[in-house]
Design a protein with these regions (language model features):
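Short, low-complexity, intrinsically disordered N-terminal modules
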Residues: 2, 13-18, 28-30
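A detector of single, family-specific signature residues
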Residues: 22-470
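Intrinsic-disorder-associated, low-complexity terminal segments enriched in Asp/Asn/His/Tyr and depleted
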Residues: 4-7
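N-terminal compositionally biased or targeting/leader segments
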Residues: 9-12, 79
Length: 470
């Protein structure tokens, strides 16, 4: 039995050893679990000496080490390949495939749950393909950890022969599990909320691209029937994403719809348009629009074909805008349930759009051990170029990580440059680098790096305070 509860959490299967475990052995096992990879076969002489002094044979510790089951899962669409290893490279079961059906996933969960000793399961975060497997194993009460595929890709490349197959990848993930046993982070219910938020952000990005493309297409069409109509109004978009100039172009899609009917008739129709769409009617606006239309040159004639094309494009744009605004609201509502929401929203330059996007792409900050880990995750950290006497003083950003996160960071940097808040440290840093003549991408990337460091510190402190309060 183990005398200290804090040690029982660390030592795990050592509780099965009948003879009381002394402090030297606890220290020895702690050294093996934290300092040494679990797949190392031999026990160092220092540990053997500590065990002899404690009166425990080395076979006891070897038996304990065999009670660690590392499960590596290589996920693909519709099926996964599973490998189960123990320390020392012991193969519990050769890699096998499991299809993503309810029955097969439940059978897999039962099998993994029946393994003796401590079992940890690791899989890569592969888009959406891993979610059925993750859901089944998490609901079965098993220890599941989802890791960045980049970590697995660069792990264990110590062979001249490059093998790329599902069984080989599953074994590699299992070896990664053994080497990082103590540092693995268990998937939790809060991760489910973050997964939903990241999925919403992915859809938000998709529909935003559609909206931008639809708007560009509409403006290109209108330039041939009503040039410059998109610049006639400066009203901001509504909560549903609709814009006044778009609604106006639907009713008055051609310049002849304005100038051919006379000022009086156009004024009446414009007034009816404002009433229908709940816009404020301005007395002088119809005359300005009418006079401006006289000087415009329409390339396309006023025919039904062009009217159909323009109005269909407007419907498509309004639909995409509606999706974008709906997703924006859902993201903000979901992000507000996370503990760091108020802290993130309090950072200058972060609003109801960028805040949820940051939280979605960064995820749980507690999984990053230091600030540099977060900047490396975002790909805004400077690379290292040193060899022998050569030490480069200026290196390119790594750009490894979430491209959507880097895009959001650059948008925040743009907001800071536009608003120029003198009391904001990130803006002062940006302005300093810009004044030094640094290229655009250099000072924007450096500003994003500094912003993430501040983000990390504030959110980390927020989570720490919440833990202490509990």
């Amino acid at each position: 039995m183990i005398r200290h509860r804090s040690d029982s959490v660390l030592l795990g299967p050592l509780a099965s050893v009948r003879k009381p475990v002394s402090q030297p052995v606890i220290a020895a096992v702690r050294f093996m679990q934290v300092e040494l990879p679990l797949h190392v076969r031999l026990i160092p002489q220092e540990i053997e000496s500590a065990m002899r002094n404690a009166g425990i044979h080395a076979d006891s510790l070897l038996e304990v080490r065999r009670m660690y089951n590392a499960v590596g899962i290589d996920v693909s669409k519709g099926k996964s390949t599973i490998a189960v290893l123990q320390p020392g490279g012991t193969v519990i079961r050769k890699p096998f495939d499991v299809s993503h059906t309810s029955q097969n996933l439940n059978e897999l969960a039962d099998y993994l749950g029946s393994l003796e000793g401590s079992t940890k399961i690791v899989m890569e975060c592969t888009g959406r393909y891993h979610e059925p497997m993750l859901k089944a194993l998490y609901e079965a009460g098993l220890f599941v950890s989802v890791v960045n595929p980049h970590l697995i890709k660069n792990f264990g490349n110590n062979s001249l022969r490059k093998v790329k197959s599902d069984p080989a990848d599953a074994r590699r993930i299992a070896r990664y599990t053994l080497d990082n046993w103590a540092e693995l982070r268990q998937y939790s219910g809060m991760d489910n909320t973050r997964t939903q938020l990241k999925t919403l952000n992915s859809q938000f990005s998709f529909f935003m691209k559609q909206k931008v493309a639809a708007k560009a297409n509409l403006i290109a069409l209108l330039d041939n029937t009503y040039p410059g109509v998109n610049k006639l109004f400066d009203s901001p978009p509504r909560e549903d994403g609709s814009e006044k100039w778009v609604d106006y172009a639907y009713s008055f899609w051609h310049v002849d719809c304005v100038r051919r009917i006379g000022l009086k008739t156009f004024t009446e129709r414009y007034k009816a348009f404002c009433k229908k769409h709940h816009y404020i009617f301005q007395q002088d606006k119809p005359e300005k629009l009418f006079n401006a239309s006289k000087e415009l040159v329409a390339v396309f004639p006023k025919e039904k074909t062009y009217k159909l094309l323009i109005q269909q494009s407007i419907r498509q744009l309004n639909l995409a805008s509606e999706h974008v605004e709906r997703l924006r609201q859902e993201m903000n509502a979901l992000a507000s349930t996370l503990p760091e929401y108020s802290t993130v929203m309090g950072i200058y330059g972060v609003g109801k759009t960028y805040g949820p996007q940051l939280i979605a792409e960064i995820g749980d900050v507690s999984r990053f051990t230091h600030r540099e880990a977060l900047t490396a995750f975002a790909g805004v950290d400077p690379g290292v170029d040193e060899s022998g006497q050569h030490k480069s003083k200026s290196n390119r950003a790594s750009k490894v990580g979430s491209a959507r996160l880097r895009k959001t960071l650059f948008q925040i940097m743009t907001t800071l440059l536009q608003n120029a808040p003198e009391d904001d440290p990130v803006y002062r840093f940006l302005d300093k680098k810009r004044a030094q003549g640094k290229p655009y991408y250099v000072y924007m990337t450096a500003g994003a790096n500094k912003f993430l460091r501040i983000y990390y510190g504030k959110v980390k402190e927020c989570l720490r305070n919440l833990e202490q309060a509990e």
